[in-house]
A protein has these predicted regions:
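Active-site/ligand-binding-proximal alpha/beta "capping" segment
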Residues: 115-149
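Non-catalytic positions within long, well-ordered alpha-helices that form the structural scaffold/packing
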Residues: 44-47, 144, 163
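Short acidic/polar active-site loop segments enriched in Thr and Asp
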Residues: 49-50, 149, 168
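Generic non-transmembrane alpha-helical segments
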Residues: 104, 108-119, 206-214
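His/Asp/Glu-rich mid-to-C-terminal helical/loop segments that flank catalytic regions of hydrolases
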Residues: 180-227
Length: 258
């Protein structure tokens, strides 16, 4: 399929950078309709080795007020109508998602955030809901009992697909609201989300600039993401059809062509 939009390719500080807007320019693709597989496949084709997701989220904790950034390290995937794997035909793979984000890339994000003096929290659990509707009060309260930190609609199956593509992944979430659980704050609406996003836009852009300058120094050369398919593909070689190997050439040629 086609990715969400044309990928912007540029160079900054002698590094090649790619940007893709998940929802398309002008925000016309619903979370459930984002072709995450096409997005990740396209980035892999371009030689992308690291992905940093920047997205808006609701807060599930009093301490995470609107405007605060969260460097997410865990996810609870509550989505149910999205294609979540590249390995769904003839070739089966089971990648580990115990630690879905790359620690070195998270360290780079933290340094970039600190340089901008942004209020942030290192580590947090992101509940990924299907959407596009916001939570009911009962759902919001349920997620709070799970000790989750934030809630949003976009990081899954994105993080899973990045892992299958052996691309390191990190998530920086910008808190825009208190979802609907907080008795002293209005229930979340689009106007509220956009207002906080606009306020944080400059901070987020500067954070990305800082990140691009220094992220390579934080990357762990032994990060297990980069060769996770070595121990993930379970299908016997003689059962791997050429049709499917061709389909997966961008994602898994490193292991399928051995």
């Amino acid at each position: 399929g086609k990715p969400s939009d044309d990928i912007l390719k540029t160079t900054f500080k002698d590094k090649e950078i790619c940007f893709i807007p998940r929802h398309g320019r002008g925000h016309f693709i619903s979370p459930s309709k984002i072709n995450f597989r096409a997005n990740i496949d396209a980035l892999k084709q371009l030689g992308v080795t690291d992905i940093v997701s920047v997205s808006a989220v609701g807060s599930l904790k009093e301490s995470l007020s609107p405007g605060k950034f969260v460097i997410v390290d865990q996810f609870i995937d509550r989505t149910f109508s999205r294609n979540k794997t590249f390995f769904d035909e003839d070739i089966v793979a089971h990648v580990s998602m115990a630690y879905p984000t790359s620690n070195g890339l998270m360290n780079a994000c933290e340094e970039a955030i600190k340089r901008e003096k942004i209020d942030y929290q290192r580590n947090g659990t992101y509940v990924v809901m299907e959407g596009p509707q916001f939570s009911t009060l009962a759902e919001s309260n349920l997620y709070r009992t799970w000790k989750a930190d934030v809630i949003g609609m976009t990081n899954m199956p994105e993080a899973k697909l990045a892992r299958e593509a052996e691309i390191r992944y990190a998530s920086v979430s910008m808190v825009t609201d208190y979802d609907c659980w907080h008795p002293d704050h209005e229930n979340v609406d689009v106007e509220q989300v956009i207002k906080v996003l606009l306020t944080n836009a400059v901070k987020a852009k500067n954070m990305i600039k800082n990140l691009i300058e220094n992220f390579e120094s934080h990357i762990d050369p032994k990060d297990p993401t980069t060769n996770c398919l070595d121990v993930a593909i379970i299908t016997a070689p003689e059962k791997r059809t050429q049709k499917t190997k061709d389909k997966l050439k961008n994602i898994a040629s490193r292991v399928l062509n051995k």
